[in-house]
Amino acid sequence: MLSKNQIKFVRSLELKKNRKREHLFVAEGPKVVGDLLKAGFRPHSIFSTDPRQDGQLVTEEELQRISFLQHPQEVLAVFEIPNSEHRPITPNGLSLALDGIQDPGNLGTIIRIADWFGIDAIYCSQETADVYNPKVVQATMGSIAHVPITYCNLVELLSKVKCPIYGTLLDGEDIYQKELQKNGIIVMGNEGNGISQEVRSMITHRLLIPNFSNSKETAESLNVAIATAITCSEFRRR
């Protein structure tokens, strides 16, 4: 049986300040929890309605009380946030730099896309949403366990690298015609404002995903997660 303190504690991890203080985050569902365990994330506590599952056995009603999902998925786990402070920031291969991505769903989807396309690392500006937000974790569908993610000063990072820096901009070259290298950093910007001016000045190769309107009116822009998928796909296609 869950105590009131347990319920209160798990629910408190919805807030970034509490996650930061406790160095803990929540993941839900057999797929996400299983992937995190396989990747070596250290569980603080596990709650499950399945008696075959490790951890504390709870009822469906109790799981509902601690879950952040509309329809809880059998298991909820609290994991330790890995210490990335001493992780070397040395981009290799093909990486993503996220400049102020705000929507948790977009961030989670981008992480999942990065996992699918074999992106080596993701570098997030301090203005980007917290990767350990429960909504982000769930949107990754377990990919958070597979892609190294680091928060850093993007301008500082980009000023030190010697690889190509790509960014999707309205004044860029057609991505389908542009010669792309296998290694580099792809910058994706904020949903409303795009790539910030400071980061934009660091971009060495400007890319454009053209529309195919046939002169009719189209959407003003692409969702940032969709744009990320198109861009990563084009890099991997070459």
Named regions from a protein language model:
Residues 1, 57-59, 145-155, 207:
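Short acidic-hydrophobic, aromatic-tinged amphipathic segments that line or gate anion-handling sites
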Residues 1-50, 128-129:
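Boundary-proximal intrinsically disordered activation/regulatory segments immediately upstream
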Residues 29, 102-110, 219-226:
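Amphipathic alpha-helical repeat scaffolds
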Residues 38, 88-173:
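RNA substrate-binding interface of SAM-dependent RNA methyltransferases
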Residues 52-64, 93, 164-165, 179-185, ...:
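Active-site regions of enzymes building and remodeling cell-envelope glycoconjugates
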Residues 55-84:
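Glycine/small-residue-rich loop that forms an oxyanion/phosphate-binding "nest" at active or ligand-binding sites
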Residues 116-117, 131-145, 197, 201-238:
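Structured adenosyl-cofactor binding patch, chiefly the S-adenosyl-L-methionine
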Residues 167-219:
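Active-site/ligand-binding-proximal alpha/beta "capping" segment
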